[in-house]
């Protein structure tokens, strides 16, 4: 589960901060 969360974190930050 942790590995999945770490994999999704960059995309989440990308959506939140609009820095893709």
Swiss-Prot record:
Cysteine pairs bridged by disulfides in the record: 14-20
Distribution of this protein across tissues and organs: Expressed by the skin glands.
GO biological process: defense response to bacterium; killing of cells of another organism
UniProt keyword list: Amphibian defense peptide, Antibiotic, Antimicrobial, Cytolysis, Disulfide bond, Hemolysis, Secreted
Keyword Disulfide bond: yes
Single GO cellular component term: extracellular region
Subcellular location: Secreted
Cited InterPro entries: Antimicrobial_frog_1
Keyword match tRNA processing: no
Domain of life: Eukaryota
Functional summary from the UniProt entry: Antimicrobial peptide. Has low activity against the Gram-positive bacterium S.aureus and the Gram-negative bacterium E.coli (MIC<15 uM). Has a strong hemolytic activity.
Family listed: Belongs to the frog skin active peptide (FSAP) family. Brevinin subfamily.
Name by which UniProt lists this protein: Brevinin-1DYa
UniProt lineage: Eukaryota, Metazoa, Chordata, Craniata, Vertebrata
